[in-house]
């Protein structure tokens, strides 16, 4: 396949699989990476007192949630938020973010070169904000 998309996959991939699809394997993660890698991201954001939380789409590498971040969508953490309320707002942004990144890839606008995200043939200094 030209692109493998992980969404809610919740499994560790083998190094051979990741290497085989290097640059063609993306994941959506419910935090503003590199902050709050792994599980329970909404709880972690609330416990840390974060003012902003969100979602990231990144290229998958051997490091868990450690690949180059392509794009992010932010949401405010509101007073009175609990995990469920925050998760619902983040999920809504994920549903906007992931199709946009897939479209950019399909249009040939997005690539990973030398471990760096390139958009419109230019290396990015940070994630695209959506």
Locate the predicted segments by residue.
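Donor/substrate-binding cores of folate-linked one-carbon enzymes
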Residues: 3-120
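C-terminal accessory domains and tails appended to enzymatic cores
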Residues: 123-130
């Amino acid at each position: 396949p030209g692109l493998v998309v992980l969404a809610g996959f919740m499994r560790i991939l083998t190094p051979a699989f990741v290497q085989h699809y290097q640059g063609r394997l993306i994941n959506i993660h419910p935090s503003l990476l590199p902050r709050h890698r792994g599980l329970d991201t909404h709880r972690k954001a609330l416990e840390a007192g974060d003012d902003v939380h969100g979602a990231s789409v990144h290229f998958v590498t051997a490091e868990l949630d450690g690949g180059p971040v392509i794009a992010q969508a932010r949401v405010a953490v509101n007073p009175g938020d609990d995990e469920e309320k925050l998760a619902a707002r983040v999920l809504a942004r994920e549903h906007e973010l992931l199709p946009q990144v897939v479209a950019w890839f399909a249009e040939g606008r997005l690539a990973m070169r030398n471990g760096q995200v390139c958009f419109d043939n230019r290396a990015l200094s940070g994630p695209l904000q959506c």
